[in-house]
Every structure is written in structure tokens, then in C-alpha cells.
Amino acid sequence: MTITRRDVLLGAAATAALVPLAARAQTSEVVIGVIYPLSGSSAQIGVDAQKAFETAAELINKNYDFDLPLAKGEGLSGLGGAKVRLVFADHQADPQKGRAEAERLITQEKVCAVIGTYQSAVAVTVSQICERYQIPFLSADNSSPSLHRRGLKYYFRAAPHDEMFSKAMFDFFDAQKKGGAKIETLSLFHEDTIFGTDSANAQTALAKERGYKIVADIKYRANSPSLSAEVQQLKAANADVLMPSSYTTDGILLVKTMAELGYKPNAIVAQDAGFSEKALYDAVGDKLEGVISRGSFSLDLAEKRPMVGKINEMFKAKSGKDFNDYSSRQFMGLIVMADAINRAKSIDGEKIREALVATDMPGEQTIMPWKRVKFDDMGQNNDADPVLLQYVGGKFVTIFPSQAAVAKPIWPMK
């Protein structure tokens, strides 16, 4: 059952003892907690995330001539020019470690807000702790649809979720079919955490609704040492489109195993995650010419909005990489949160929450191809329009929707 915030009654007396001293009227700095995997198999995600958040913090704390919230002027004008200070925490891709780190950030580091977390499974526990302490949590890059449907008052997500992303995929399939492409059967391949499960559920529902046949629906254990049996099943099913929902390590293993077993599908349309990461293409990019991934961000937007390219160069100077689907959402996560804190003119959790609820940021004032940032009563931004990107010649180009596309899709993939 979907729970809205109107259904939730939080007893002030019961929770008052848990609220940290975050109601200081004026402060020289605003401390925001950032929780990501900084060690383990997903560590590179966390390292890149640090650079994205540091880029956003630099833009906020210094003066830049960009049409972006908080770029002009130094610091948060609503708090007397207070600077943003980030405190990073390592959840090690472990939901329980994430829970502990969130509590440490709130009770010891005295953060007024938390942003995270890459893995949706970690966002579940982190957001629960933030709710308990009445501290706003912003899912910068978590995409599981169920996250915003738990009735949490302090949960917000500016980016699309996997139902929105999957709808874009099926809109693309429909458009391709109208153009003469043969797309009738699908194979789903997904890991067994909340990310993979929610993604597969969304795709299954859309396939039924749009008249596509799922000939294989394969769930595997995340971080499996072998995917040979699963790839044999995919090869036997021989669907028109393979739709993987896998993080980077699993994605690399999937592609290597497909090559070893001689399985080359006509098309791969991926639910992002590992398939948007440079590490995957560094490892197996030679086998993925023409792969399609959904996304929130396209560097092609810089042609229409020059500040996107300039901010990308700021990030690249720190990271050695261009923005991708994750780092762009992480950057915007801090901009959205800091903008709310600035409008709240406070580091009190409830006042920041109220400012987040009132957010209405035009898409032109972001680095994303979104209409705007405006949250519904469950904390979801429904105006974050996805795009589809195709990997061609060592880079991604936007192929869908038509109003954002800079190239025609290559179908089938090479």
C-alpha cells in the first residue's frame, strides 16, 4: 500500500528527545552529511561522488556567473553568507553500516541534512534514521520506486525512479517498432537487492501493458562469483532485447561471460547502474558498441546550455572524468538541498523540510534535461525527464526522446 505524508502522524513529544541541537539561528557554516561507498567493490562510485559534491560545494561557496541556484555570490545569503561544509561517511555498500554512519553524522557531526547513497538498499536504512531524528534526507541517485512510498516525511528525491526510467525505455521500443524494428521479446536480468527487484517489477508491468513478451526473467545474487548458468539461460531465450539491471562489478562479469559463451543479443537496453560507469567501459567497452542505457543526464545539453559544459569542466578538473548519470545527480542533489537550506534561513530540520516541500526550481537552472524540480506529497520529483543514451565510438550520445536526441539510434547494436 502506498502511504502518503498525510497519513503519517509523528508525535512531537515522542521524538523531541531524538532531535539534535540543529536549530541554531545563525552559523558560519552549514554541515551536510554525505554517505557513499568509499571502500569495497563500489569504492570508485564513492570517490567520484566526492568530487561531484565538492564541485557543487565550491560553486556554492565561491562566486560564479552561472544561472544556477547559489552560484552567484559566496555562501548561503539566507544564513549571512555561511559556507557549506561536507562530512563524508563510508557505508561500504552495507545497509547496516549505512544506518550506523547516518546516526553518527547526525548525533556526533551535527549535520543538518544528509544526502546519499548510490545503493537503494542503503538508502532504506539511512532514510529511516534521518526520519527518526527529523533530519531531511535527499536521495541523490537512488532509483528504486518504493523508496518514496514509505510515508516518510523527511525523504526527498529530485531525480527519476526506475518506473519513470523504464517507461522511457518502453516508449523508445514503441517508437522503434513504428519505424520497422522487430521488438517482440525481452529478457530481464537483475540482481536481488531492492534496486534489481524494483526495476524488474516495473519492467514486467510495462511489458504486459505494452504487449511485449518476457521470455526470460533471471534474478541473480549481487556480487556473484560466476554468471555462467544465468548467461546460458539468456542465450537460450534469445530475446530481441536484453534488459540488465546490474551494478558495475556484476555488469563487467555479465559482459565477459556473454563473450566467453558466445552470446551477443541484438540489443542491450540497460537500467543504468554499472552501464553508465567509466569503469565498466574501461574493462569491456570493446564488447559494448551500441549498448543503450537510460539516464538523467546528457553532456549533449551543453550545446544548448553552455553553463553545463563549464560546470562539467570544473568537475573534470577534480575527477579526470566527465559528468555521468550518477555524478550529475549527485551534483544536483547538493544544489537542491543547499537551495532549500538557504531559503529556510535555518539549519533546523523541520524548517529545511518545509523549504524542500516548497521547492520549484526551473529545469533551465539545473544541469539536467528536466522540466523542473518540484516535489509531490511523497517527496518525489515527477518532472525529472529521463533520456536514453547509446555508447558509440567510445562515448554516449543522446538518442531519445526526439526533442533531446542528437543522433539516430543504431539498431540492432553492432
Q: Positions of the model-derived regions?
A:
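Secretory targeting signals
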Residues: 1-3, 15-16
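Extracytosolic ligand-binding ectodomains
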Residues: 2-10, 25-414
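N-terminal signal peptide c-region/cleavage motif recognized by signal peptidases
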Residues: 20-22
